[in-house]
């Protein structure tokens, strides 16, 4: 099963223990970027991928001409603003440097969050397809830097704001309560992580057993104890 490092790997590893009790052996394969897992899934090197939200999967399918499918909802983990220097949107200085993910849907997602915070205005109706070229108002003259998502936590020491997906927050040892100050709503569509598979195996016994194992009471309890509200089960 393909996952990105951090909480997704931890949760899938726990789900693998439950799956083993149900007769299914799961090999957990960790990746450090957002594109390789879906590529490996589409190529048949993986059976499932657990790390992305639905808009990211749709973008991948569109760009790569693939037909990966959502087989279940996984966990909820909102993106947020992180900083060592400031603790509120009001404290963001003019000319602040802000880092966002450089992959298409999470970059757009970060720009939408900056807009929600009142720091930017974007071209209308762009959604997660928004890019820095769609910024139509930038009242604080923010300098937006696009970085690999896994590198964003390192930028917290050097920049005023980093807009970071929760899995990389946790894997870097940051905490929402200690280092963050503005977040997506828990109900935001981009906060919901899904389990993806190929069309040829969505109905397979292997996939069904893994999904049932992942969405089990044991895994829900593990998530609650381990992540203390930063990540929540969707079931």
Question: Which residues does each predicted region cover?
Answer:
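Beta->alpha turn/N-cap motifs
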Residues: 6, 30-34, 44, 48-58, ...
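A bilobed periplasmic-binding-protein/Venus flytrap-type ligand-binding module shared by bacterial periplasmic
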Residues: 78-89, 191-204
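Short helix-initiation/N-cap motifs at beta->coil->alpha
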Residues: 29-39, 126-154
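A conserved helix-loop-strand patch within extracytoplasmic ligand-binding domains
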Residues: 71-120, 220
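Short, polar/charged alpha-helical segment
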Residues: 5-27
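Short amphipathic alpha-helical coupling segments at ligand-binding clamshell hinges
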Residues: 94, 202-213
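Periplasmic-binding protein-like
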Residues: 108-115, 214-234
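Ligand-binding "clamshell"
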Residues: 59-71, 86, 158, 163, ...
């Amino acid at each position: 099963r393909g996952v990105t490092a951090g909480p997704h790997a931890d949760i899938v590893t726990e789900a693998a223990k439950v799956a083993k009790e149900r007769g299914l052996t799961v090999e957990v394969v960790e990746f450090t970027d957002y594109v390789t897992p879906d590529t490996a899934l589409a190529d048949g090197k993986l059976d499932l991928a657990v790390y992305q939200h639905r808009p990211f999967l749709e973008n991948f399918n569109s760009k790569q001409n693939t037909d990966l499918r959502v087989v279940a909802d996984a966990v909820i983990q909102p993106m947020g603003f992180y900083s060592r220097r400031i603790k509120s949107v009001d404290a963001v200085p003019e000319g602040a440097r802000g880092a966002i993910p450089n992959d298409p849907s999470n970059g757009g997602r970060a720009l939408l969050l900056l807009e929600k915070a009142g720091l930017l205005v974007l071209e209308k109706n762009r959604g997660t397809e928004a890019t820095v070229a769609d910024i139509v108002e930038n009242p604080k003259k923010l300098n937006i830097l696009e970085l690999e998502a896994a590198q964003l936590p390192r930028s917290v020491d050097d920049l005023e704001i980093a807009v970071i997906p929760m899995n990389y927050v946790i894997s870097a040892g940051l905490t929402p309560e200690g280092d963050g100050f503005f977040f997506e709503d828990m109900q935001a569509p981009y906060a919901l992580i899904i389990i993806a598979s190929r069309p040829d195996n969505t109905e397979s016994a292997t996939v069904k057993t893994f999904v049932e194992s992942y969405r089990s009471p044991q895994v829900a309890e593990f998530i609650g104890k381990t992540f203390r509200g930063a990540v929540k089960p969707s079931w």
